[in-house]
Amino acid sequence: DDERLEILKNYHVTSIELGAQSMDDDVLKINRRGHTAKDVENASRLIKSYGFSLGLQMMTGLMGDTDEKCIKTAERLIALSPDTVRIYPTIVLENTPLADYLRDGSYRAETLNEAVSLCARLLLMFRENNIKVIRLGLHSGGNVDEGYLAGAYHPAFRELCEGKIYLEKMLSELSKLPKDMPYVIEVPEKSIGKAKGQNKRNEKALLNNGFQCKIKGNEFLNDYDIKITEDI
């Protein structure tokens, strides 16, 4: 409310993050989040009106959630023009209500591959709207490593998502080209490893799709941009 924001302003706070988690009221209710999508919208607008930097957090794989609902959540968060976003896939820890739901079959945890595919789409959506995703996936360590039971947890989750983006872009462009010749695929210099994929999985996927490619760096390309030429 206004009173609390005034206090934060007086203490020279510059940024505020809200744990929206979802913008679907049914999902919020099922997961007992204690707020509605309208609450997030109202709070976000009030925070921005005071000049604070606004950060929003969303989760994937919550009870009652779907990929379509997550995409809608991202669209509604984008409409609020946050400065930053964090995206966290849901994981299940031992000795939690979610662990009980998992065991009795009322909840199915999101798989790693499902989360990577979805979060790759979300990452591009926010980027296309000039919103920085400052965190994608949980940090490793602590209670997560000790109590992990199920869900999309990987210490290099963001790298997997970015690798997925590059693979889909490469396959999309290569599908327009003949398979009977080798190609050079240029990617941003800093993203060579992501484009090749962990354990070179993307290179293997290209080969499995009938394309012989070399992946090289180009310092003039922007994130997720690629350039394909014949390997003469």
Model-derived features: positions:
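Conserved non-cysteine loop/helix-boundary elements of the Radical SAM core domain that shape
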Residues: 1-90, 94-113
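Auxiliary Fe-S-binding modules of radical SAM enzymes
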Residues: 97, 104-232
